[in-house]
Amino acid sequence: MTHWPSPAKLNLFLYITGQRADGYHTLQTLFQFLDYGDTLHIEPRRDGEIHLLTPVNGVENEDNLIVRAARLLMKAASESGRLPAGSGADISIEKRLPMGGGLGGGSSNAATVLVALNHLWQCGLSIDELATLGLTLGADVPVFVRGHAAFAEGVGEILTPVNPPEKWYLVAHPGVSIPTPVIFKDPQLPRNTPKRSIDTLLKCEFSNDCEVIARKRFREVDAALSWLLEYAPSRLTGTGACVFAEFDTESCARQVLEQAPEWLNAFVAKGVNLSPLHRELL
């Protein structure tokens, strides 16, 4: 049995710069990983079978991103003659990241499967090939595959590695799940934020264009942010529902965590520019 980190991410800022004819939104965002997340346990099989041993409530196994990622890698490696005969896996997950939280849990799970099985099966696909596969599963999967904090443009697929400060964060889940389409279909979502260079953006105060919609439509998000803002700079990650406050030290973050209201599910984690998944491979 092998054990693989599947870390969370934060969007340190998120700006919607337009909407394409196909309905997808163009954006500029800054991804950073957390030293906190799910853990995947993978046992290679020799009979070509893929088994997910820990089903997720409400999601059929074959629809789960974990299984889809495994089958995608199997197909791509087989078609290019790089899949050893009988390659398969038993996969289980220790789930800590909430669904619909904006922490990238499902995308991170898919990326971990692609990276881990490519290693365990010795397929030899490059990071670029894995990232291309990952993009077919979701726009956030490639950043997890590549494993470095990144500035993202386009619909999130154009990645430039960056090294923002590695601060401490108090991350809070307000107890609601926000489907991404709810935010992106809202007519009041800002869709014309001017595009700026990464150098300019890093000098500006960070914000998230989705936050005003999430706070308006979900009172729990509004309440969580109102509480966090009493202590530190705070904002929404992704399209929510999770919110986070940033601190210079772990002790400051934990002091605030001790005062968290009971209705908030919160944790403290460090922002890291190298993914914990990729640290495992060093």
Curated annotation (Swiss-Prot):
Positions bound to ATP: 98-108
Keywords, sorted A to Z: ATP-binding, Isoprene biosynthesis, Kinase, Nucleotide-binding, Transferase
InterPro entries: GHMP_kinase_C_dom, GHMP_kinase_C_sf, GHMP_kinase_N_dom, IspE, Ribosomal_Su5_D2-typ_SF, Ribsml_uS5_D2-typ_fold_subgr
SUPFAM superfamilies, A to Z: GHMP Kinase, C-terminal domain, Ribosomal protein S5 domain 2-like
Gene that specifies this protein: ispE
Identification of the protein by name: 4-diphosphocytidyl-2-C-methyl-D-erythritol kinase
PANTHER family in alphabetical order: 4-DIPHOSPHOCYTIDYL-2-C-METHYL-D-ERYTHRITOL KINASE, CHLOROPLASTIC
Organism: Salmonella agona (strain SL483)
Annotated signal peptide: none
